[in-house]
Swiss-Prot record:
Designated gene of the protein: SV2A
Native species: Pongo abelii
Classification lineage: Eukaryota, Metazoa, Chordata, Craniata, Vertebrata
Cytoplasmic-side positions: 1-169, 227-233, 284-294, 356-447, 620-626, 673-685, 732-742
Listed name of the protein: Synaptic vesicle glycoprotein 2A
GO biological process: chemical synaptic transmission; neurotransmitter transport
Transmembrane segments: 170-190, 206-226, 234-254, 263-283, 295-315, 335-355, 448-468, 599-619, 627-647, 652-672, 686-708, 713-731
Amino acid sequence: MEEGFRDRAAFIRGAKDIAKEVKKHAAKKVVKGLDRVQDEYSRRSYSRFEEEDDDDDFPAPSDGYYRGEGTQDEEEGGASSDATEGHDEDDEIYEGEYQGIPGAESGGKGERMADGAPLAGVRGGLSDGEGPPGGRGEAQRRKEREELAQQYEAILRECSHGRFQWTLYFVLGLALMADGVEVFVVGFVLPSAEKDMCLSDSNKGMLGLIVYLGMMVGAFLWGGLADRLGRRQCLLISLSVNSVFAFFSSFVQGYGTFLFCRLLSGVGIGGSIPIVFSYFSEFLAQEKRGEHLSWLCMFWMIGGVYAAAMAWAIIPHYGWSFQMGSAYQFHSWRVFVLVCAFPSVFAIGALTTQPESPRFFLENGKHDEAWMVLKQVHDTNMRAKGHPERVFSVTHIKTIHQEDELIEIQSDTGTWYQRWGVRALSLGGQVWGNFLSCFGPEYRRITLMMMGVWFTMSFSYYGLTVWFPDMIRHLQAVDYASRTKVFPGERVEHVTFNFTLENQIHRGGQYLNDKFIGLRLKSVSFEDSLFEECYFEDVTSSNTFFRNCTFINTVFYNTDLFEYKFVNSRLINSTFLHNKEGCPLDVTGTGEGAYMVYFVSFLGTLAVLPGNIVSALLMDKIGRLRMLAGSSVMSCVSCFFLSFGNSESAMIALLCLFGGVSIASWNALDVLTVELYPSDKRTTAFGFLNALCKLAAVLGISIFTSFVGITKAAPILFASAALALGSSLALKLPETRGQVLQ
């Protein structure tokens, strides 16, 4: 047995000696032909190979395969396991080399580094002679980030722009499309859902508010987590939350559960905008970033068009429904809610095929993962361009030194929920600290000014875009009221009413021994009238009231004439039998008004297409600030035309005009937000600003709609002032065109 171990050890030592001799001779031959080479990125020269000292030719006896034989003499050999025998620290193979990945620590000697400036002996993110991590200053950390930014930009240029970016463009576009759909879903289903769920005006207002509240929470939550856990992972989770609760909301029956599902659906989709733009920007080189981020904004418009088209095609089809008794009803509007979850589901499926952002990997010290993703980008684009032979030549990428990590505790420490609690608290503390750093000395001014721009833009845009349809409905109501027919002092005896009465007022009438059977009443009012010995059967009504009327010996059978419809009326010896079941409230239902909501939203969303195209083509030519300020000024000017909107067609045209000129400012604001913050704060800052945007939207909608039917001057003044303030603040921000991504 001992003889076998001795032979084995001798064989290993001989093989190692041969390998080292071959390595040294190869190095000498290469050095003779090419003594020194120069890095094309860093312009830095270094030796291709260097002699190595091999002091440890064989493992210590204490590393023995058999734990009890560690005291044997080295020459006897029984001191190595299958995992460690033949181990030489100088000849140790870097783990990633099994997959062809160069080591993060290999940039000091003999390897090519991608960089835009010379780096002195960078190894693993630390410069030569640098002190321990605890003594590192903010200036040194800033220097590292600047070096990484230049280096990363050079790598993206080598990877080129091609098939990989376009594939990711459509994948992330689906996620952005899901956000555009979410904004319109509740507004489209309310005319139909209000009867099924018996929604009062306050219930409808809360349902519209809860979506923005959920998106506000989601933007802040997922934006902060994406800087710590990764863009792709957080986007997958947020879209999954959105799709699951959107699916549930199409089946739940009660108002409370529907409200809860739409809240969590909004929380899920709230992460899409901050993560999508940050994620995509980290795969784009500087010369492509502004244009392609603007093209990406088109998917939000596509989401709005998709929602309007689906509402128009699905909701009016009452045959697309079924009922299980009187407790469970599934009408066509629920099919529409289900269909609106499709973009989110498709985005999840497509996103699983995409890699994590390599910039996130580098910011978190994951060199190997970043190198593999960038190699995938390079190889995909080169194959698509017909150059599969081109090799990804970058062998070292700078990584940022990590000063804080998630707290790890042993698996045998406490219970599983205690361990998860510790990790969650640690993660929450890091997210909160990262958020507070956006208000640190370096970024305080930028953050405060961006808050002002985001708030004013959102306040005016969302306020006006909701005010427009409300004004259109008000104009429709005014026109409808102008066509009301009035019947004063009529006397009707022994007549059977079995048809439809609409938009009528009957004053001072007398109805004696009349029958109202199968009657449909829509916007009908009876005032100061007498009903004696009358019979009402199977009567349905909406917006119908009896004011100051008297009913004598009258029977109501199977009607929906509930108590609140009799205003200051007297019922003498009158009987109500078997009232209709269902919602006792007046609802508008689906009809011409609902169709108008779909049509106006469809046109208003489609009208932003020209603005999207213009902003994409000019974003990198005129700059982000000029685009933002110019579009805001044009939007401000367009607000003054609102005073001329005295008809439906005029208001629709003004809505399209405002949407078309304001979209360019939104595109510029998205690009500017991405480029103003560094990679470790990008989604956190974007998420916070987007959450502020939703808060401003709620305020704008509440304030603007309160003036409907009262005055148009106040909304015009508020919107113009907000846009003017936003454009003036935007001009004080730094221009980011031509800058590398921090």
